[in-house]
Each structure stands twice: as C-alpha cells, then as structure tokens.
C-alpha cells in the first residue's frame, strides 16, 4: 500500500503516516507540462502501471499538438480568475496551457508572477482581453464567487469575453490536462482563433 500526499498537506499528517509504517509518496505542485508528465509517470510506477501512465502522457502530447495547431492568431492577454480574485501566475499549469495556445497570462501585468489575489480595481484597470473562469453560471454560491459577477466585471467581460475551463480539468496537473487543452482550443474557436 502507498499513501499519495501533496507536499503542502499537513506535515504532521505525513509524519504520522510514516510513523505508522505507511509508505508515503510525496508530490510537489506541478508547475509545468514537463512536471505533469513526470508526475504521471511516477504515479504509474507507484501503482504498477507504467504502461497506463505512458498512454496518458501520449494523450497529453497529442492534445499539445492539437493545441499548437490551433494557436491564437492574436496573442490575447487572458487572466485566469477564480473566486475571491485568485489569479494564476506565470508559475502555474494554467499559464502553461495558455502559452501552448499562443495566449499570454495577464497576471504578470498585475504585478503577480506567482499565483495570488488581485483586487477588482486592478483587474478592471488592466483590462485583459479575456478572463478565464471555471464556470459560466450567473448565480454566485458564496461571496468569493460573487466577485466574478460584480457589475464592473460583467460590463467589461460579458459572456463573449469569458472563456470557461471547468476547474476539475485545470486545477491540478494530471491526465485531465488533455481535456483542458481541448477545451481551451474550443474556447479559442469561439473568438475565431
């Protein structure tokens, strides 16, 4: 048996598991496509299915090829925006996905090369071409997601200027990034590439 843990989960929990004799495989946050591929392969080795891991890596490589063929004609500035104003910086999987498709991550112009929070005022002042969000609902579940429906953002970013990739496809690195890339390509086609 093996317990898979993120390096950023509670250290005490990981230590307890190790003291209990559990084999703990610790994974860092994947910040690039190469990191994702390495982690897929590592997980395949851990569970005794390196062949399945290679299938997923090949699937991701094929999605990258499709995405590069559909590269945006214009280097649109896109801000990946989540609840409470969280933005994905240059050192994120989201930024890697944007780069593959010829888009640029607008977080850097907000002064954030790493992921963090941006104010509504900074977002409105910067005016990226599009915002990338995880759903297109017009009702907020809580105050954090209500920011995405703020009148200023709705005015600047109506549905035609919002790109949607479901959170479960891009929140972490893994085999689902193939689907995230395909979804991003579909979103690009909505604006004519």
Label for each model-derived stretch:
Residues 52-103, 170:
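Basic- and aromatic-lined ligand-binding clefts that recognize polyanionic substrates
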Residues 93-115, 135, 161-164:
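His/Asp/Glu-enriched short active-site or ligand-binding loop at hydrolase and phosphoryl-transfer sites
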Residues 18-22, 45-49, 61, 65-72, ...:
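Sec-exported extracytoplasmic/periplasmic mature domains
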Residues 7-11, 30-38, 47, 51-54, ...:
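Soluble non-cytosolic domains of exported or imported proteins
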Residues 5, 26, 80, 105-108, ...:
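Structural signal for conserved beta-strand scaffold positions within catalytic alpha/beta enzyme cores
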Residues 36-40, 49-50, 68, 73-80, ...:
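N-terminal hydrophobic signal/anchor transmembrane helix of membrane proteins
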Residues 1-46, 117-161, 190:
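Acidic/His-rich segments in extracytoplasmic proteins that coordinate ligands and/or metal ions
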Residues 15, 38-41, 45, 58, ...:
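Solvent-exposed, polar/charged alpha-helical surfaces in well-ordered, non-transmembrane soluble domains
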């Amino acid at each position: 048996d093996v317990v898979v843990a993120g390096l950023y989960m509670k250290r005490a929990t990981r230590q307890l598991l190790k003291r209990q004799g559990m084999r703990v495989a610790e994974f860092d946050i994947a910040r690039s496509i190469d990191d994702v591929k390495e982690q897929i392969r590592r997980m395949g080795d851990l569970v005794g299915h390196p062949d399945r891991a290679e299938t997923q890596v090949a699937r991701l490589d094929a999605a990258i090829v499709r995405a590069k063929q559909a590269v945006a004609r214009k280097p649109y500035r896109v801000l990946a925006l989540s609840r409470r104003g969280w933005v994905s910086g240059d050192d994120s999987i989201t930024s890697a996905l944007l780069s593959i498709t010829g888009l640029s991550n607008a977080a850097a112009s907000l002064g954030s090369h790493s992921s963090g929070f941006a104010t509504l005022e900074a977002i409105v002042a910067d005016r990226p071409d599009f915002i990338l969000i995880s759903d297109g609902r017009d009702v907020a579940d809580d105050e954090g997601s209500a920011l995405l429906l703020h009148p200023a953002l709705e005015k600047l970013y109506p549905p035609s200027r919002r790109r949607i990739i479901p959170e479960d496809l891009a929140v972490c690195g893994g085999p689902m990034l193939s689907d995230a890339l395909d979804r991003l390509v579909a979103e690009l086609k909505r604006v004519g590439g």
